[in-house]
């Protein structure tokens, strides 16, 4: 999709398919392999968006991108639906096909995103915030069940 649109794409990570993917990557795609955390932060800082094409139960990398003020273009299944907000923190593509991704990339080009809203949204998933929300929920349910009023 990025090759067809002439967009640069940097891919981070390795795995069993690395050599195969590197061989089929076109002129605008660069596979970087495994990189350290400092380099990942530099990549987030220098990118226009983070592309999240996989389906995972909960992906932390889209939140890392948002915390860096970068929107996410994600496959609209799995954990991305919990972390990406259409039009606010990114956009989705519906199928894992070149055409669907091209549509999302073109749509993305017409969108604008507020870096501060992206960061605020990512902070909602911070460990301490999450723990505090869980604790408050448990306390509320305990109090309801035991007739305790605040």
Regions found by a protein language model. Name each.
Residues 110-147:
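A charged, aromatic-enriched C-terminal amphipathic alpha-helix characteristic of glycosyltransferases
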């Amino acid at each position: 999709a990025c090759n067809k649109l002439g967009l640069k794409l940097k891919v981070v990570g390795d795995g069993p398919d690395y050599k195969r993917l590197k061989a089929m990557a076109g002129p605008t795609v660069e596979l970087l392999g495994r990189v350290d955390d400092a380099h990942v932060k530099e990549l987030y800082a220098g990118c226009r968006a983070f592309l999240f094409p996989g389906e995972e139960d909960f992906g932390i990398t889209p939140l890392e991108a948002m915390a860096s003020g970068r929107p996410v273009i994600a496959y609209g299944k799995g954990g991305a639906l919990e972390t990406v907000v259409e039009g606010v923190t990114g956009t989705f593509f519906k199928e894992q096909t070149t055409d669907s991704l091209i549509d999302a990339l073109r749509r993305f080009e017409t969108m604008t995103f507020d870096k501060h809203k992206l960061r605020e949204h990512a902070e909602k998933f911070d460990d301490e915030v999450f723990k505090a929300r869980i604790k408050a929920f448990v306390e509320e349910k305990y109090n309801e069940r035991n007739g305790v009023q605040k």
